[in-house]
Amino acid sequence: MRLFISLPILIVVLAMALEGPAPAQATPDLASTFENLPDKLKEFGSALEDKTRAAIEHIKQKGILTKTRTWFSETFDKVKEKFKTTFA
């Protein structure tokens, strides 16, 4: 039963693959590629800038979290030592 179902699907996929690219998928000519190049570079630059800014903000916030965590642990250790010396 599986063979009867898979053979027609295989034939259709093979026919689509051998057909080649559709006209809309054809490679663009060199002139249109160079015309779109500045727009593509601006888009790439903007995306890179946004990602870089987001990464820097993440690092800054992560640094703040690390500093806060160390401050709390140091303060807790100091309080713990005071309790030990006071009540010992």
From Swiss-Prot:
Under the heading Gene3D superfamilies, the entry gives: Apolipoprotein C-I
- The keyword Transcription regulation belongs to this UniProt entry's keyword annotation: no
Q: Which UniProt keywords apply?
A: Lipid transport, Secreted, Signal, Transport, VLDL
* Broad class of where this protein is predominantly found: secreted
Q: Where in the cell is it found?
A: Secreted
Record GO biological process: lipid transport; lipoprotein metabolic process; negative regulation of cholesterol transport; negative regulation of lipid catabolic process; negative regulation of very-low-density lipoprotein particle clearance; triglyceride metabolic process; very-low-density lipoprotein particle clearance
Signal peptide region: 1-26
Which cellular components does GO assign to this protein?
Answer: high-density lipoprotein particle; very-low-density lipoprotein particle
Tell me where on the tree of life, at the top rank, the source sits. Eukaryota
MF terms per GO, please? Answer: fatty acid binding; phospholipase inhibitor activity
Q: Does the keyword Signal apply?
A: yes
Give each disulfide bond as a residue pair: none
What is the annotated role of this protein in its UniProt record?
Answer: Inhibitor of lipoprotein binding to the low density lipoprotein (LDL) receptor, LDL receptor-related protein, and very low density lipoprotein (VLDL) receptor. Associates with high density lipoproteins (HDL) and the triacylglycerol-rich lipoproteins in the plasma and makes up about 10% of the protein of the VLDL and 2% of that of HDL. Appears to interfere directly with fatty acid uptake and is also the major plasma inhibitor of cholesteryl ester transfer protein (CETP).
User: Could you say which protein family the record assigns here?
Assistant: Belongs to the apolipoprotein C1 family.
- Name this polypeptide is given: Apolipoprotein C-I
